[in-house]
Swiss-Prot record:
Family: Belongs to the TRAFAC class OBG-HflX-like GTPase superfamily. OBG GTPase family.
Keyword line: Cytoplasm, GTP-binding, Hydrolase, Magnesium, Metal-binding, Nucleotide-binding
Cofactor: Mg(2+)
Species in which this protein is naturally found: Xylella fastidiosa (strain 9a5c)
Example GO biological process: ribosome biogenesis
Protein known as: GTPase Obg
Residues given in the record as GTP binding sites: 166-173, 191-195, 213-216, 293-296, 324-326
């Protein structure tokens, strides 16, 4: 199934039922008073987070969602039945935006979270409410109120533990295939990955985490160039960023790039850091490890020397790894270290939760 992470829908709440104009008509009571009942309230539209969904693809086929209208009031003070609510299931991680105001009105982060997105109209009053000392037989009733109507933009942010980032063709999809059961498309041209791919990495029988292969970024991504900001947002909820670099991208004797993604390794790092900072500076505060890929394309000693020179030039202090995603060499230690990091993060969060009570 293709991953669809954005959709636009229209939600229409039900109108309230109209109030009724009616009078008692019973034997021996020729001048019965007003007994018109109220209309029922219109149904509302709700979004509910569902852990069993992981895509917005269903909204490509169904875009308009309507709740039921309230039933009109009736005589003998009978109230109209309320309209049935419309429940729309969305994946966990869905951000809800009001298109008219560009305001974020909800963020569905837990299974079962409910968000009211269109409130049903209130039912109208029947004529029994308008009786007074000077108007014993009112012939007026109030119509039901109109239900709310909105156009919503749904954006899905992946709930992954690890986000992989890097320029196109550095080997992200190959890496995720190597460490998980995911099978993203792999080919030797840019933007092979057009949708984020999720892979589950199992370390032990009961230890696992989710890794997201986000489509390749290019210079100007923060401004929407290439696949743009629609995928940068997926990195915001991750616990760890793996910054993949093609270590085989080298220059010839004249200084012209001749191998790899078209950028020297140090440029791959610095240019992508600029894009992250422009999109969301908080991304640079996340744990970020450097993964130097394609070490298999050169002798081992040369790859190690290039890697150490790059780390020194960057003044890199965070963890870094020299790997070959194709042969899987060096990939597994990264996953084990990531699991150790996540366990530590959970322990710290638990301690902070206890101390704040």
């Amino acid at each position: 199934m293709k991953f669809v992470d954005e959709a636009e829908i229209q939600v229409i709440a039900g109108n309230g039922g109209d109030g009724c104009v009616s009078f008692r008509r019973e034997k021996f009571i020729p001048l019965g008073g007003p007994d018109g009942g109220d209309g029922g309230d219109g149904g509302s539209v709700w979004l509910v987070a569902d852990e069993n969904l992981n895509t917005l693809v269903d909204f490509r086929h169904e875009r308009i969602f309507k709740a039921q209208r309230g039933v009109n009031g009736m005589g003998q003070q009978m109230y109209g039945k309320a309209g049935q609510d419309k429940i729309i299931s969305v994946p966990i991680g869905t951000v809800v935006i009001n298109v008219q105001t560009d305001e974020v009105i909800g963020d569905m982060v837990r299974h079962g979270d409910r968000l009211l997105v269109a409130k049903g109209g209130t039912g109208g009053l029947g004529n029994m409410h308008f009786k007074s000392s000077i108007n014993r037989a009112p012939r007026q009733a109030r119509p039901g109120e109109q239900g709310e109507e909105r156009t919503l933009k749904l954006e899905l942010k992946l709930l992954a533990d690890i986000g992989m980032l890097g320029f196109p063709n550095v080997g992200k999809s190959t890496f995720i295939r190597a460490v998980s059961a995911a099978t993203p498309k792999v080919a030797d041209y840019p933007f092979t990955t057009l949708y984020p791919n999720l892979g589950v990495v199992k370390i032990e029988a009961y230890s696992s985490f989710v890794i997201a292969d986000v489509p390749g970024l290019i210079e100007g991504a923060a401004d929407g160039v290439g696949l743009g900001t629609q995928f940068l947002r997926h990195l915001q909820r991750t616990k760890l960023l793996l910054h993949m670099v093609d270590i085989s991208a080298t220059a010839d004797a004249y200084g012209n790039e001749k191998v790899g993604v078209g950028l020297l390794p140090i440029e791959q790092v610095r240019k992508l850091e600029i894009e992250l900072e422009r999109h969301d500076p908080a991304l640079l505060d996340k744990p970020r490890w450097l993964v130097l890929n394609k070490a298999d394309l050169m002798p081992q000693e040369e790859a190690q020397a290039l890697a150490e020179a790059l780390i020194a030039e960057l003044h890199w202090t965070a963890p870094w790894y020299l790997v070959s995603a194709v042969s899987r060499e060096g990939t597994w230690p990264i996953m084990k270290s990531a699991m150790t990091l996540f366990e530590h993060q959970r322990e710290v969060a638990a301690e902070q939760s206890v101390s704040s009570r």
